[in-house]
From Swiss-Prot:
Pfam annotation, one family: Ribosomal_L3
InterPro entries given in the database record: Ribosomal_uL3, Ribosomal_uL3_bac/org-type, Ribosomal_uL3_CS, Transl_B-barrel_sf
UniProt keywords, alphabetically: Methylation, Ribonucleoprotein, Ribosomal protein, RNA-binding, rRNA-binding
Naturally occurring in which organism (per UniProt): Alteromonas mediterranea (strain DSM 17117 / CIP 110805 / LMG 28347 / Deep ecotype)
Keyword Isomerase tagged: no
Name listed for the protein in its UniProt record: Large ribosomal subunit protein uL3
Region described as Disordered: 135-161
Stated role: One of the primary rRNA binding proteins, it binds directly near the 3'-end of the 23S rRNA, where it nucleates assembly of the 50S subunit.
Location of N5-methylglutamine modifications: 153
Molecular-function GO term, any one: structural constituent of ribosome
Family: Belongs to the universal ribosomal protein uL3 family.
GO cellular component: cytosolic large ribosomal subunit
Superkingdom to which the source organism belongs: Bacteria
Quaternary data: Part of the 50S ribosomal subunit. Forms a cluster with proteins L14 and L19.
Length: 212
């Protein structure tokens, strides 16, 4: 897994190419990520890089977190994220150093992970894209009902995983192979073509695309 960044979804806008083509983009603010820990094969059984981003009020930090950040010599952040490292990756990175959007200067496509917008309890039509039943012609009660959910006495149960009504959204989602339109190192911004998961202001994890 490649090294990535923790950013924040600012919102969507559009930019124009030289020939006047409009490109919809999502703006991701990725302030410098501070390295809080380096996990090693010897002590942890795997190699990884742990970073934090943003800030957090001192009265919102417990003693364990405060000690962890103090040991790394960095300001307390709002989240902790790990990126797995390959065998020879991250050799020049030290605890307390910073990682900026510069790492994406030569990257053409990225994967963005975030928490999708929560929609609450939704029916099978909205949640699973089921077709609705007839609005008339004898149907007076089951317009948006899912239909049959099983068989008869055999097997005599509803199988696990059956698509039914329930909680929609508020899940971790990764959108893959999004095109990087622009990287603004000075302002710590990444402009990505298209939409990314989550609401405006949510944290997102940006990594080089796996399927690039």
């Amino acid at each position: 897994m490649a090294i990535g960044l923790v950013g924040r979804k600012v919102g969507m806008t559009r930019i124009f190419t030289e020939d006047g083509t409009s490109i919809p983009v999502t703006v991701i603010e990725a302030t410098p990520n501070r390295v809080t820990q380096l996990r090693t094969e010897e002590s942890d059984g795997y190699r990884a890089l742990q970073v934090t981003a943003g800030t957090k009020k001192a009265n919102r930090i417990n003693k364990a977190e405060a000690g962890h950040f103090a040991k790394a010599g960095v300001e307390a952040g709002r989240t902790l994220v790990e990126f797995r490292l390959e065998e020879n990756e991250g050799a020049d990175i030290e605890v307390g150093s910073e990682i900026t959007v510069e790492i994406f200067n030569d990257t053409k496509k990225i994967d963005v992970t975030g928490t999708s917008k929560g929609k609450g309890f939704q029916g099978a039509i909205k949640r699973w894209n089921f077709s609705s039943q007839r609005m008339t012609h004898g149907n007076s009660l089951s317009h948006r009902a899912p239909g049959s959910i099983g068989q008869n006495q055999s097997p005599g149960k509803v199988f696990k995983g059956k698509k039914m009504a329930g909680q929609l959204g508020n899940k971790q989602v990764t959108t893959q192979s999004l095109e990087v339109v622009r990287v603004d190192v000075e302002n710590g911004l990444i402009l990505v073509k298209g939409a990314v998961p989550g609401a405006t202001g949510n944290d997102v994890i940006v990594k080089p695309a796996v399927k690039a």
